Amino acid sequence: MATNAKPVYKRILLKLSGEALQGSEGFGIDASILDRMAQEIKELVELGIQVGVVIGGGNLFRGAGLAKAGMNRVVGDHMGMLATVMNGLAMRDALHRAYVNARLMSAIPLNGVCDNYSWAEAISLLRNNRVVILSAGTGNPFFTTDSAACLRGIEIEADVVLKATKVDGVFTADPAKDPSATMYEQLTYGEVLDKELKVMDLAAFTLARDHKLPIRVFNMNKPGALRRVVMGEKEGTLITE
């Protein structure tokens, strides 16, 4: 199989959904999936790629149901941020067990648990080939973890945001509901907006577009997909200018 000898990206921002960590379980963290993801991230580090990671929290907390019951949105979002910290702690531990140097940073201060987010420190760690896990979203309510991924991706000057999902890429329709749906290999930001394709929420997507930050959507459940993406092979959907 012909592959590039060297990775096409030097620094990436990997966005993992919380749901990806729960595996076939309906809730929580599947240890085997966590360890597999840690091994795939380790492969990237061994290729010399600098890796920032943003993880969602949907496997541990879902605010929608409580919001319907009357919970304040700000409170729900704060709980969601803490869920991402819990996932970050689990990922840091899995990386350490895989002998990968990793640092967990939080956008909200949690002294004694993890470091406070510092842009300068994050850049320094990445340059020294440390995996940096960026948790607690943006630190503000009303912003999704996709927004956090794009914001941090821009801040750390990542070459791309790699959005790991449960499907192979961006499709013409929901492949779970429409068997005739086909996958796009490449799209422009404008095409995504015109076709109203579900890539990420509008705030996150326009942030990436305005800063010309490429997004690649791929299936994290497919073994080796992450490596294929960084080696420039055909995998997932690329969204650029």
From Swiss-Prot:
One protein family per Pfam: AA_kinase
The protein's Enzyme Commission number: 2.7.4.22
Record's keyword annotation contains Methyltransferase: no
Pathway: Pyrimidine metabolism; CTP biosynthesis via de novo pathway; UDP from UMP (UMPK route): step 1/1
Activity regulation details: Allosterically activated by GTP. Inhibited by UTP.
Function: Catalyzes the reversible phosphorylation of UMP to UDP.
Family to which the UniProt record says this protein belongs: Belongs to the UMP kinase family.
This protein's name: Uridylate kinase
Organism: Citrobacter koseri (strain ATCC BAA-895 / CDC 4225-83 / SGSC4696)
Lineage: Bacteria, Pseudomonadati, Pseudomonadota, Gammaproteobacteria, Enterobacterales
This protein's encoding gene: pyrH
